[in-house]
């Protein structure tokens, strides 16, 4: 079984299903391009790589982290590690270049909104964006992010799902995007993924 570190099996299965969709929908693209925001120990980076290698595909992986929590090591040798704030390095990537963007950085409402609008244009039509720690079961005041007030859910895990609702993603109100997965392990104190497909070019 491929290991994904802190990501639950439910979350991992949704991510793997999405990567499988990508492999099927882009049969002529040997290399699958991925951006991950928030690296930590790199387990999810290695998990996605291992899954794609098992599918006989290559991976061009960019991992972004600002090292606020700790020094970050490159998850694997071929990974391109970018040290910096996600909202400051997004223009290093070409528009319509990525098959999959995994957002697991600063879990506050304003940062999740910023990450969507900074990176949505980087996703190619038919590609996907995945947001972590979106479970409906989560205590919105859990997982304070170290900024703002501990009593403000927008500065805690509650900010992630609220951000997706504010953008219009959760109810399929944002043109050009479609909700594919909204799943979580109810026994997990964190976690959950919302995965959205880009169904037309962002403009």
Residue ranges of predicted features:
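A short alpha-helical cap/connector motif
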Residues: 1-102, 106-203
């Amino acid at each position: 079984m491929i290991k994904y570190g802190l990501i639950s099996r439910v979350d991992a299965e949704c991510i793997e299903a999405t990567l499988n969709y990508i492999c099927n929908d882009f049969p002529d693209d040997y290399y699958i391009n991925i951006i991950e925001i928030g690296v930590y120990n790199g387990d999810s980076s290695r998990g996605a790589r291992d899954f794609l290698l098992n599918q006989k595909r290559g991976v061009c992986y960019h991992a972004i982290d600002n090292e606020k929590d700790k020094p970050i090591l490159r998850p694997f040798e071929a990974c391109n590690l970018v040290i910096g704030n996600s909202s400051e390095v997004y223009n290093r990537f070409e528009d319509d270049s990525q098959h999959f963007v995994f957002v697991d950085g600063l879990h506050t409402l304003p940062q999740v909104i910023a990450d969507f609008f900074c990176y949505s244009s980087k996703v190619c039509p038919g590609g996907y964006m995945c947001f972590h720690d979106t479970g409906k079961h989560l205590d919105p005041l859990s997982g304070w992010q170290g900024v703002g007030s501990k009593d403000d859910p927008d500065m805690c895990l509650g900010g992630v799902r609220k951000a997706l609702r504010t953008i219009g993603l959760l109810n399929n109100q944002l043109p050009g995007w479609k909700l594919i997965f909204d799943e979580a392990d109810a026994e997990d104190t964190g976690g959950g993924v919302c995965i959205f497909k880009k169904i037309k070019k962002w403009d």
